[in-house]
């Protein structure tokens, strides 16, 4: 079987530090498990910033906003100041809806699951650039 040189295995993250100016780090399963930082992750993040001055960005498929994602970091053992930004699917969806549909003034219906971390539907639609009428009249 031919050797695929596009993939390399490294014994330590430190093998990669000098090769890149920054890192995009997936949130769940790489940085934390939803309850606390994974073993060594908070220390590595601190070292990447303080010792090596690397730029760090969080990537997450959460439906929450980037701000909400960063606000949870302290409870997971991370200092938010170490991250340039957080890119979340929720934030990107809101941006896309705003850019694509807000000018048309079309109505929207949002389906999601209930969780303490999710934005309220009204707040999410406001982030999408929608004026939110406070009515549930189905005739509208």
Residue ranges: model-predicted function:
Residues 1-140:
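HAD-like aspartate-dependent phosphatase fold
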């Amino acid at each position: 079987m031919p050797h695929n040189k596009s993939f390399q295995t490294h014994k330590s993250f430190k093998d990669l530090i000098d090769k890149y100016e920054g890192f995009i780090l997936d949130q769940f399963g790489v940085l934390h498990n939803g309850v606390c930082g994974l073993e060594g992750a908070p220390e590595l993040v601190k070292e990447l910033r303080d010792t090596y001055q690397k730029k760090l960005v969080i990537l997450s498929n959460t439906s929450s906003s980037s701000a909400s994602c960063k606000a949870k970091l302290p409870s997971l053992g991370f200092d938010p100041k170490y991250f340039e930004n957080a890119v979340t699917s929720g934030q990107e969806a809101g941006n896309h809806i705003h850019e694509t549909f807000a000018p048309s003034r079309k109505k929207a219906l949002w389906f999601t699951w209930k969780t303490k971390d999710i934005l309220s539907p009204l707040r999410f639609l406001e982030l999408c650039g929608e004026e939110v009428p406070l009515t549930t009249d189905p005739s509208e």
